[in-house]
């Protein structure tokens, strides 16, 4: 058994290669092999968002605070709120982030395949973000 106490792991700033705007990542768990699951609480300041990306085994988002937007490639920008759970299928190109006026916090859970949990791509343009 392992208990990870809240606040026991340092926060990290979301790197500008992967995010637009101010993003804080608070690691929750990252299990060693043979497990492959990891998770973090991610907080986006208003207007902040991920770059386009995919996950080899998919990703689950659990919205805990604020208001945000998500979009899969070719689909509409959709609003998410606390209590919403979003599933992105393996290989589904997508982005997620805060709405223009509201902070968003969600828990992100994904699994690694051959040591990789995410494939980062190009930044979401302002036009794409605005839908």
Name each region found by the language model:
Residues 30, 54, 62, 80-82, ...:
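Conserved strand-loop elements at the edges of beta-sheets that form or border functional pockets
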Residues 1-37, 117-131:
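A short, N-terminal "cap"/entry segment at the start of jelly-roll beta-barrel domains
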Residues 24-27, 38-55, 90:
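Conserved short histidine dyad/triad with adjacent acidic residue
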Residues 60, 87, 101-121:
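A short hydrophobic beta-strand segment most commonly corresponding to one strand
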Residues 41-45, 54-70, 109-112:
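Short, conserved beta-strand element in jelly-roll/cupin
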Residues 50-52, 70-71, 88, 93-100:
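Short beta-strand His + acidic residue motifs that chelate non-heme Fe in jelly-roll/DSBH
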Residues 74-91:
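Short acidic-glycine-tyrosine-enriched beta hairpin
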């Amino acid at each position: 058994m392992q208990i990870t106490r809240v606040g026991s792991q340092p926060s990290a700033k979301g790197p500008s290669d992967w995010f637009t705007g101010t993003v804080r990542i608070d690691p929750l768990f990252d299990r060693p092999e043979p497990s492959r699951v990891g998770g973090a609480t991610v907080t986006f300041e208003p207007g902040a968002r991920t770059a386009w990306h995919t996950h080899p085994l998919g990703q689950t988002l659990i919205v805990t605070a604020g208001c945000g937007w998500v979009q899969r490639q070719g689909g509409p920008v959709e609003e998410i709120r606390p209590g919403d759970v979003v599933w992105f299928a393996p290989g589904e190109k997508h982005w997620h982030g805060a709405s223009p006026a509201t902070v968003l916090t969600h828990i992100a859970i994904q699994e690694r395949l051959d040591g990789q949990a995410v494939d980062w791509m190009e930044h979401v343009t302002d036009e794409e973000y605005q839908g």
